[in-house]
């Protein structure tokens, strides 16, 4: 699965930089975020992974989860990794960077 590939790469990138990786779920039947990258107990990036975001329902579910967690965790760096798309999406005064999995895997980690 795509989430597993991203997780393994996050482990590789974060192990040398003193970052921790968490899964986030607000309440039992609510929104979740696949990866919360933290540095010293502060969320520095929220990452959602979805193979296909072409369907409006899927796109809204993934972006709404990021926006909701962003407000709760006070984190503005929001990334949605999809299999093929790269673009920016703005909502609620926030910018979600949508990036293809290949592009994300090939770029260096920015601290």
Model-derived regions, located:
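A cross-kingdom feature that marks ATP-driven nucleic-acid transaction machinery
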Residues: 1-111
């Amino acid at each position: 699965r795509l989430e597993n590939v991203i997780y393994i790469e996050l482990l590789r990138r974060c192990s040398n930089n003193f970052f921790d990786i968490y899964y986030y779920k607000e309440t039992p039947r609510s929104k979740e975020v696949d990866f919360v990258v933290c540095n010293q107990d502060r969320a520095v990036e929220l990452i959602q992974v979805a193979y296909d975001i072409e369907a409006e329902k899927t796109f809204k579910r993934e972006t709404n989860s990021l926006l909701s967690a962003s407000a709760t965790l006070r984190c503005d760096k929001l990334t949605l990794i999809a299999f093929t798309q790269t673009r920016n999406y703005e909502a609620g005064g926030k910018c979600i960077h949508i990036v293809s999995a290949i592009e994300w895997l090939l770029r260096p980690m920015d601290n």
